[in-house]
Amino acid sequence: DMEQKQVKRVPYGVSDFVKVICRNQYYVDKTLYLPLLEDQADYLFFIRPRRFGKSVFISMLHAYYDVLNKDKFQELFGDLWVGKHPTSLQGQFLVLYLDFSQVGGNIEQLEDRFDRYCRVRLDSFVDVYRQYYSDDFVKKVLEAEDAIDKLILINDESKKLNLSTYLIIDEYDNFTNTVLNEQGEDVYWAITHAEGFYRDIFKKFKGNFDRIFITGVSPVTLDDVTSGFNIGWHISTKPEFNQMLGFSTEDVREMFTYYKNNGMIRPDSDIETIINEMKPWYDNYCFAKSALETQCKVFNCDMVLYYLRNYMNTGEAPEQMIDPNTKTDYNKMRKLI
């Protein structure tokens, strides 16, 4: 029975890397991409559809680079690829993490809510890293009126103290896509162009962080808010990152084999048959032109885990091959295309 306890649990809907590791959940190792990303420009944009494991991936980045995790490296990464190949940047940054799916509301409220969300995150940032700043400085940031003021204070002070900062933005286009869908072009244009508040904060991000990693689901907003950001920073279609998110066929094979060997799925299961059955449904994704010929396509993470859980419970494929949770996203995407 002890053996049974040690079998890794199937994660589903978990977007926090640290939880996945600490709760002994199955993790598809993506850490070999860390040195590849470090070789790219300092500011990176990465676009993928929903449910490809974006949030787990960026929480892995966060955990890896956060100075507060410097001493937890073995505990978090010891069993992963990077555990044997750490880069010199591990644990070197103060990380500001923003998730813009937390911002919503109609256009009248949007700017206020956006500012409030950023204020809360910036206050939390100086609180979490208060050991690196003076008490007076922390007080000054907490008292500053709006997000841009807080941001400028933090950036200036960090430069003065030689602290390296890393900005991670998840769902950067979440509320702008909602605006586009629900309130139309004009409203969208107002916030993403010229003096629009959203465009404005992007200008402030640039040049003020040592590294930036921004991710979302569509390139639409990207072009609108990031003119002046260099094109080389857009790595979504670079072949070497084609399989950075999602599961490769090999990942899926390894996962199902692991659960079969641990007696969690039927001993007579034919894994190649399972993969072939899933393929037409789950792996029509390819993000780099040159990868179409040379590389395997990638499977949607949530769908594979949905299939696996179903297979463990019933011994067969789910009756509904598409996880009902993903349907709503496809309808949203259709509007954007």
Residue ranges and their predicted role:
Residues 221-228, 235-309:
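Amphipathic alpha-helical segments of the small helical/lid subdomains adjacent to P-loop NTPase cores
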Residues 101, 170-171, 205-230:
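A short beta-strand-to-loop transition that corresponds to the Sensor-1 phosphate-sensing loop
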Residues 29, 63-127:
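P-loop NTPase motor core
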Residues 153-160, 187-212:
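Substrate-engagement module of ASCE P-loop NTPases
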